[in-house]
Amino acid sequence: MQEKKYGLFTTITMITGIVIGSGIFFKSDDILQYTNGNMLLGIAVFLIAAIAIIFGCLTIAQLAGRSDATGGVIGYAEEFVGRKAAGALGWFQVIFYFGTLVPVVAWVSGIYACQLFQIESTLDNQMMIGFVIMTLFFAMNMLSGAVGGYFQNASMIIKLIPLLLFAVIGMIYGKPGAVISHDIESIKSTGVSAGWLTAFAPIAFSYDGWIVAVSIGHKIKNSKRNLPIALIISPLVILACYILYFVGITSLLGTDTVMAQGNDSVFLAATQIFGHIGGKLILIFVIISVLGTLNGLILGFIQL
């Protein structure tokens, strides 16, 4: 009988930790550009985009509640559809999904590592560092899945710190109510063009990766109960974090400043809060966020 290693909390951090990567830190300006600086429409974009992950999770939760098959969605496909469908899905996941996502996320970790340690940011250096990091995480998870689970829990908690910090400080020292009131009046007076719908493009990838968590279903304690619960709770946690961070940083800096500063807006906000070390702190949090995503992907990959 296989040892059950992961509890409900690890399962939730697996889903949220993979989905919440580094991208959310740098998406606020893109969304505001597409919505013409309207924060309320930006919130609507997050809500509508979350429909896919929420109902996707609810759908898979129904299968998870009926099966504890190994291999995640591949096991579900074999049990509820057939071996051919499971085989096709398995090859797709190995070659096109994990086979591309894992190296790309590892490379991104190499990019941020070069920035943090002031290493010459050449493609060779980025890829070499990313390869070393990827190899270390594969070794860690293959030698001890429990250690991988602990890292997933820790990285998820750590990456939430700056998101919630910006949210709280923005709510306190910014004026989100005034911004939303202004946005409502703007919509009433000028209307809304269809152009704001293009804001879905920059955040589409910000909701990806949740399906990986079902790969560890056979290692989850009482998986028929805990996995469906995690699949229901996690998308709501992700949505709440995204909206709170977006509202917080936009209220703190102002929509015009966020759009003008672009990706540097998060570093500007961090500098206002923490002083000259703010930029370094944010970079550390971003790297931890990427490593949490990478660890979750690898943890799910080796359980296929």
Task: Label every model-predicted segment.
Residues N38-V45, A154-I158, V214-T250:
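Junctions where cytoplasmic loops transition into the N-terminal start of transmembrane alpha-helices
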Residues I157-I187, A204-S206, F246-L253:
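Hydrophobic alpha-helical segments and their helix-loop junctions in multi-pass secondary transporters
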Residues K5-I15, G82-Y97, I129-I133, T190-A201, ...:
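Select transmembrane alpha-helical segments in multipass membrane proteins
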Residues D30, I54-M134, A139-M142, V147, ...:
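Hydrophobic transmembrane alpha-helices that form the core helical bundles
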Residues D29-I31, E79, W196-N226, A230, ...:
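Helix-loop junctions at the membrane interface of multi-pass solute transporters
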Residues G75-E78, G82, Q115-I119, I232-N295:
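TM-loop-TM module centered on a large, flexible mid-protein loop between adjacent transmembrane helices
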Residues Q126-P176, L231-P235:
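Membrane-interface loop-to-helix entry segments
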Residues M1-L40, I53-L58, T70, I184:
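Membrane-interface "cap" regions at the ends of multi-pass membrane proteins
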